[in-house]
Amino acid sequence: MTINEKILSNKDLNISDWELDFYSRPIIEKNGKKRWELIISSSKNFETEKIFLWNKICPANEVNSIWLTKALNEALKDAERKGWAKPLKIRFWRASMKSIIKKSIENIGIEALVSRRTYELFDRIEFLEKEIYPLESGYVRGVLAPTFTSNILNDPNPLPEAVRGDALTISEISIEELKSAQNWPIEFGDIFPIQNSIKNENLVPGLRLFSKDRSLALAAWFSSLEPVKLLIKQNQLILEASEDDKWLVTDLQEKDAKELNDKFTQTKKDSCGYQFISIQSTPFVEKFAGFWILKAVSYTHLTLPTKRIV
């Protein structure tokens, strides 16, 4: 196949980054060992409406980079058969498995990115934990493999002076506006399709940053952060990012903090927890140096006493 033929062939393939988790699950196998499982999901984007999902159980005595590299190659072959191009990046967030996962991803020639911007993966894990695992023999009620929560213990670091911009505001946009984000002029950022089932008039809270002379520099820095979600803690607006980073965006008056926290809570109910960050030179330009859609993910396991189901 010539280079031009390869290019034309790739245009016919679905294109997306991948999101990955490799860890134990709340199931005890017949041999008395915890189940280990590789879970893969493609990231939602505007290139395709499809989602690639792939799972493989790993024997407890083979939890290593050799097994994972082999499994990833199997996943790539299966994805290609189903019409998917090889991903450029694979995101993962499981800190205790970082060495094995990173090595295995790099073994197959793909960039490994430690990030909690794995919203499709969180949805997939939540579905498995609620709908699939409880039906299996050996299921254990309780916490065997904690998924992501926002209870990161480290204190937030203040945003560097150079990236605070000239001004910031807390704002809201409608779901209808957010759905059209793919048509906006955006230099840096990460956006993805919004669920169609959400009412267009529902509002999404977010952070707007302005810098007349350094908006692109700010956007480039934020892009390297892998921003995950905004939250309020002790009258402070916090940005969670990357693997376990926390950034103090600004201090708020108690009244303002409560009002914004209420908006975040309401958005979780009405709009799937969507949030946004935008960076512009001024509030009046119709161009974004940076724009990110975020999602307030907070999944927890069952907290019932541990009990094996047979």
Each language-model region and where it sits:
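Long, charge-rich C-terminal accessory regions
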Residues: G138-D256
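Electropositive, glycine- and tryptophan-enriched low-complexity nucleic-acid-binding patches
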Residues: S42-C58
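Acidic, metal-coordinating catalytic cores used for nucleic-acid/nucleotide bond scission
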Residues: L88-I101
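Short, basic/hydrophobic alpha-helical segments
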Residues: S65-L88
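Long, charge-dense
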Residues: A112-E136
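An active-site-proximal beta-strand-loop segment
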Residues: K6-E47
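Conserved small/polar residues in nucleotide/adenosyl-binding loops
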Residues: T300-T306
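Short, surface-exposed basic-aromatic patches at helix termini and helix-loop junctions that form
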Residues: K102-V114
